[in-house]
């Protein structure tokens, strides 16, 4: 890398697997830091090498629980107190992003709160991928580099060479994302219209469009309990689809998700490795985003544009 200022990459406990791959792509060593856990549940963070005057990249997805967010905040605080030149949070999966608006009375807006916490802690820039809502970028008063998993998904889909390809959105809210995929791949778009009984429980779903004899790929930003995406797959197969696959950026896969995917009529469930997945569901496959994040880090360090990486 041709830059006059040093940079260092560190990772919290949650994303070390991805940070190591990012460092391999960058040709650098993952920085050494220590996270000490205490009997009362608290933990402390310390850098085990000098970061004075360095650009510090901190890799940590804020999932599956709030400990990972707190760990990242402590990493940021420690870096600031250790005289880092700049602090860049690399958050492959930005948790709390579904709480992006006040959609009913007396509710919190978790995404805005997390943005404020990160900013107050001391980050100078955020690099993230496929936020649940694009407007979350506006919650920050610092630069946000928003990457898209479509950069790796679209070539994968093209290589499948499906002759009767149809792109589907599992709900109306994801129609913009699915429409971009359909336009790039030059194929039809199908929508699903769903109603919920309560959070994570889909009551009814209807297909808007023709899937008979088609190879359907459902596109979403994340899969949580997999209720929506597996119900959509089953309904599309019942409507005559030749095959149904799904791709989603973030492998949240909580609760009964793995069992639902395994029992569903999905042929394949494709994710990135923004979140580790250790359940041995044979239908689940992960593509790494390490090279994409490494390239973003290179370009940040060299003051180059990131947008020309995007396919859509």
Residue ranges and their predicted role:
Residues 1-312:
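PRPP-associated nucleotide enzymes
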């Amino acid at each position: 890398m041709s830059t006059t200022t040093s940079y260092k990459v560190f990772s919290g406990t949650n994303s070390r697997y991805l940070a190591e791959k990012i460092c391999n792509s960058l040709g650098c060593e993952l920085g050494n830091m220590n996270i000490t856990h205490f009997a009362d549940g608290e933990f402390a963070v310390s850098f085990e090498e000098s970061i004075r005057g360095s650009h510090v990249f901190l890799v940590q997805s804020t999932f599956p629980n709030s400990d990972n967010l707190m760990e990242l905040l402590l990493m940021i605080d420690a870096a600031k107190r250790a005289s880092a030149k700049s602090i860049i949070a690399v958050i492959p999966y930005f948790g709390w992003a579904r709480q992006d608006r006040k959609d009913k009375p007396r509710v919190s807006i978790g995404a805005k709160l997390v943005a404020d916490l990160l900013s107050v802690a001391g980050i100078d820039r955020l690099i993230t991928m496929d936020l649940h809502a694009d407007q979350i970028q506006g919650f920050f008063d610092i630069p946000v580099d928003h990457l898209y998993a479509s950069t790796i998904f679209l070539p994968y889909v093209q290589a499948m060479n499906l002759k009767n390809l149809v792109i589907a959105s599992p709900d109306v809210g994801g129609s913009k994302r699915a429409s971009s995929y359909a336009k790039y791949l030059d194929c039809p778009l199908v929508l699903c219209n769903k109603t919920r009984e309560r959070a994570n429980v889909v009551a009814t779903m209807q297909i808007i469009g023709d899937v008979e004899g088609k190879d359907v790929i459902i596109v979403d930003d994340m899969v949580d309990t997999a209720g929506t995406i597996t119900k959509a797959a089953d309904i599309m197969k019942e409507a005559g689809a030749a095959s149904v696959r799904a791709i989603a950026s973030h492998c949240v896969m909580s609760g009964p998700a793995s069992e639902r995917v395994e029992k569903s009529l999905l042929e394949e469930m494709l994710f990135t490795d923004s979140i580790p997945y250790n359940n041995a569901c044979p239908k689940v496959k992960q593509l790494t985003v390490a090279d994409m994040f490494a390239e973003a880090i290179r370009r940040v360090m060299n003051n180059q544009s990131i947008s020309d990486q995007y396919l859509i």
